[in-house]
Amino acid sequence: DIVLTQSPASLAVSLGQRATISCKASQSVDYTGESYMNWYQQNPGQSPKLLIYAASNLESGIPARFSGSGSGTDFTLNIHPVEEEDAATYYCQQSNEDPYTFGGGTKLEIK
């Protein structure tokens, strides 16, 4: 299975500043020029919400302050400017190889 390592595990960012979350895969999640890395936001008691798919594509309805980048094994989620409603736990997920796997999560706190 592909192991995804997220960092940091928790993050406190001031309102209006930038939050940066990293995800490193144990092997490449690229295939035919596409990076099969996705990012989700989860609030307590709710299902995860897809933010970014294929490394850098913004899901419909998601604010443009969310952006994703990376390829191969190294990926980044940026949130800028951070808003209060962004306090949540964020997960990367690879969809290149079964079983699809998730990172351990990053809990974002807004100061």
UniProtKB/Swiss-Prot annotation:
Chain positions covered by the region annotation Framework-4: 102-111
Complementarity-determining-1, as annotated region: 24-38
Transcription among keywords: no
Region (Framework-3): 61-92
Keyword set, alphabetical order: Adaptive immunity, Disulfide bond, Immunity, Immunoglobulin
Disulphide bonds in the chain: 23-92
Region (Complementarity-determining-2): 54-60
SUPFAM superfamilies: Immunoglobulin (SSF48726)
BP terms from Gene Ontology: adaptive immune response; immune response
Keyword Transmembrane set for record: no
Region (Framework-1): 1-23
One Pfam family per UniProt: V-set
InterPro entries reported in the protein's UniProt record: Ig-like_dom, Ig-like_dom_sf, Ig-like_fold, Ig_sub, Ig_V-set, IgV_Light_Chain
One GO location term (cellular component): immunoglobulin complex
Region (Framework-2): 39-53
Note: This chain was isolated from a myeloma protein.
PANTHER family cross-referenced by the UniProt entry: IMMUNOGLOBULIN LIGHT CHAIN
Protein name: Ig kappa chain V-III region CBPC 101
Organism field: Mus musculus (Mouse)
